[in-house]
Amino acid sequence: MSGRIEYISGPVVKAELPGARLYELVFVGELKLFGEVVRIQGDKAFIQVYEDTTGLKPGEPVERTGEPLSAWLGPTILGRIYDGVQRPLKDIESISKSPFIARGIGYDKAPPLDLNAVFDFKPAVKPGDFVQPGDVLGSVKETELITHYITYPPLPENAPGEVEWVADGKYKVDDVIARIKTKRGVVEVKMWHKWPVRRPRPFREKLPPVEPLITGVRVIDTMFPIAKGGTAAVPGPFGSGKTVMIRTLSMFAQSRIIIPVLCGERGNEAADALQGLLKLKDPSTGRPLLERTTIIVNTSNMPVAAREASVYMGTTLGEYFRDQGYDVLVLADSTSRWAEAMREVALRIGEMPSEEGYPAYLPTRLAEFYERAGRVVLIGSGERVGSLTIAASVSPPGGDFTEPVTSNTLRFIGAFWPLSPRLAYSRHYPAIDWLMAFSRYVDTVEVWWSKNVSPEWRRIRDVLQSILVKEAELQEIVRILGTEALSEYEKHILNVAFMIREGFLKQDAYNPVDTPTSPIKQFLLMKAIYVYYEEGLKAIEAGVPASILRELDTVKRLPRLRMELTNDVAKEELTKFIEALTSEIRSTTAGRRP
């Protein structure tokens, strides 16, 4: 079960390792560094090492484990900060006695779970009940916000059977809490189990994504929505607001479990993001957001190979909570750094490069990642449903959206939220470019909006979007000929577009009145602008200049409403405002002939 190092090239080690399996976890060198077999040629294995290889030398041992890189799944996951291979960073700090991560700290020294933690286990089954993989056996209260459901693990060796015994009371995470009698023998179930990170967890059926994931961000929820179980990409250059977007989604997205994966970002930026996440409070309860969050951190100065592990690890943790019936959101920042790690490892093991040096399997890996999202019927008894939503940022060099990572990502996502440096530098946040962005979920979530908010939602949204497109066309004329060349109707279009941008699309992520915005407030803000547009058209037909409409008191107040009205009073106050706006615009046509 062991071999010897033959040569070392950065994060890649070649070893003579008879019997090695693809993607098998191995320990490299005297320090027992984490590694994963990524290529096999006869008895030779190419290993990507998840720790710094400085000081390794040929002839040192390589030890096989016989199992793939796996996530440890069970209570005590929530509230922890892991590295790419699920080692708790706080435990590593206490072992290292240094702010820098020491090498060779294995799961024996820093286990991903606190196996000695005691929880009050409440059984959901009783002796004699028939259970199958995926069924809930019981639950523990992991945090004040989350109940952790213990399921019969859907491992290949676990078969359906009869409950022989089930625990009730206080038990450790590593204690047996149930015995299942199957045709293959008796299975002892603990509160935790392992799952290979590259293998998607099973489900019974994939459902269409019909319920929107409300984020509190107006440009997303209304203009370019994402559904629960959907996928989204947030590409943008440096300074365009990707990290603030991830923070906002972490805090306000209506998912029960949030898993941010900081993959390959700058260390200082990751530290700032971590400090911000640790201070966040759950908006509905006031409890620390960390009680329903697990964070995976792999900065740019950590070994590049671990970036790949961090992405798969975060997705596996998300699937685990999805299998408990929760709505889960995985936020990866950023997939470009993961792709760069793939490129470096692929070139070092001698694989044929493709476009811009990336490996030919880049689209396959991106597809495997995004396809693990979904709203699904869970395996086991009953019709339990869970969802895993994936939103990932992309960092194209120089903001070039035609580079391979961004262009391939476009093939596999349902929502595209490109961040514009032009908008960011003009202090328009979120800097989502509404002319480039798209969402494939508008049709599927329309029923939810019509049923829960208003049947007019889709029609008004489409009108406002068409006004923004028309504004872009008119801006070309204005640049050449000036506003004097425009008709009153076209001037009105520009005025309405300004209201859409300033009064609806722009949003202050740090203002508690402006963020988050409830669905009903979003709709009524949108409707107020729509009323200004429609009633203004009638007034212009009656001979009222667009400049007079723009100077009305209610119209002047329109861009400020988002900052003035809280979510709890928005419905009543905005309804009154729309009536006043309609009345004031109509009063301008009194005594005029069309």
UniProtKB/Swiss-Prot annotation:
EC number annotated for this UniProt entry: 7.1.2.2
A GO biological-process term: proton motive force-driven plasma membrane ATP synthesis
Broad EC category: translocase
Gene Ontology cellular component list: plasma membrane
Topology with respect to the bilayer: Peripheral membrane protein
One of the record's GO molecular function terms: proton-transporting ATPase activity, rotational mechanism
Main location: membrane
Pfam families xrefs: ATP-synt_ab (PF00006), ATP-synt_ab_N (PF02874), ATP-synt_ab_Xtn (PF16886), ATP-synt_VA_C (PF22919)
Catalytic activity: ATP + H2O + 4 H(+)(in) = ADP + phosphate + 5 H(+)(out)
Positions that bind ATP: G236, P237, F238, G239, S240, G241, K242, T243
Disulfide bonds: none
Keywords for this protein: ATP synthesis, ATP-binding, Cell membrane, Hydrogen ion transport, Ion transport, Membrane, Nucleotide-binding, Translocase, Transport
Assembly: Has multiple subunits with at least A(3), B(3), C, D, E, F, H, I and proteolipid K(x).
Function: Component of the A-type ATP synthase that produces ATP from ADP in the presence of a proton gradient across the membrane. The A chain is the catalytic subunit.
Family classification: Belongs to the ATPase alpha/beta chains family.
HAMAP family per UniProt: ATP_synth_A_arch
Protein known as: A-type ATP synthase subunit A
Species of the source: Pyrobaculum calidifontis (strain DSM 21063 / JCM 11548 / VA1)
